[in-house]
Amino acid sequence: MKSSLLAASLMSLAGAASADHPSGDRYLTPQFSAGQNYSNVFSILRSIKADGYDEHASRNGGSADYSILSASNDGWVTRAKGRYDGQASGDDSVEFRDNGRTYCQLNAGGKTSCNAYLEGSGLTYNATIWGVPPKQLVQGMSWTVDVKQAWELGGSNGTEKVTVVSVDAATDTAILLREGASEGFYSESDAHTVQLTHDGHTETLEVKPGTSHWKGYTTFVKGVVFSDELVVTRQDLLVSKSGSSVNATERRVMLLNAAPFPTL
């Protein structure tokens, strides 16, 4: 076969493969434009069980509304209104950079404060938690992510495996499974002490966190989270003021779903 014909044949095969497996950007990169609106609702349940103590359980939840103000190839600016029920609501202009890895807020005095986005879930795909996906998504494929920083539902030096459960090119929908493990305290809402009840008496115990394990499904539609659930368990050691200790299992169940705009 002549080189020109061979090149044409290879290009044709590459085009066919690309058509069969569209770019991962279609599924996992948001295609925002100014004027679009989104909302989600969310909750996190936390429970701690230790022998000899009453189980402690608490839950918080709320909703958030997003109005896209501007968008570029690797970032976007949104007005974000959010509320955890029972707490004060927030209303801020937030810029997401680096395809969602970094968020920046305009503080009083006109100064911008930027931080890594380390939430367990959110409006969009976040490569800090999910890793950089392959150029093309195929059902059954997987990749590994090193989550070095502690985040909302995991400790530091974590490792996570992401598996493509299914893709639907007709709706630009991808379902991913994430499963991982880490060590130590989480980045937020993770107190170093806990109060548990024993024989009718409340006792304050020091928390020494061990290994966490998480697993859950997330559905993305054009890069936006449509539904997300994650179950996290961690083995802790609780130490009393007298120095005695007891093993404990801590569990968190996170749920986030897209909702009709607005919720607030």
Region annotations inferred by a language model:
Residues 20-98, 147-264:
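Acidic, serine/threonine-rich low-complexity disordered tracts
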Residues 19-26, 113-133:
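Amphipathic/hydrophobic helical signal segments and adjacent flexible N-terminal regions
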Residues 2-8:
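Sec-dependent signal peptide recognition
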Residues 82-120:
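An acidic-aromatic
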Residues 121-165:
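Extracytoplasmic beta-rich ectodomain segments of secreted or membrane-anchored proteins
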Residues 14-16:
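N-terminal signal peptide c-region/cleavage motif recognized by signal peptidases
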